[in-house]
Amino acid sequence: PAWLVDCPCVGDDVNRLLTRGER
């Protein structure tokens, strides 16, 4: 999501987790 980009500190980690969860 775009709101994750606002927090690069955990953007990558959260993005990976969400990507795996969504799919």
Swiss-Prot record:
Coiled coil in keyword set: no
GO molecular function: toxin activity
Numbered residues of crosslink 2'-cysteinyl-6'-hydroxytryptophan sulfoxide (Trp-Cys): W3-C7
Domain of life: Eukaryota
Cross-link (Cyclopeptide (Ala-Pro)): A2-P8
Lipid metabolism keyword on record: no
Keywords, in A-Z order: Thioether bond, Toxin
Post-translational modification note: Processed by the macrocyclase-peptidase enzyme POPB to yield a toxic cyclic heptapeptide. POPB first removes 10 residues from the N-terminus. Conformational trapping of the remaining peptide forces the enzyme to release this intermediate rather than proceed to macrocyclization. The enzyme rebinds the remaining peptide in a different conformation and catalyzes macrocyclization of the N-terminal 7 residues.
Family: Belongs to the MSDIN fungal toxin family.
Name of this protein: Phallacidin proprotein 1
Organism: Amanita exitialis
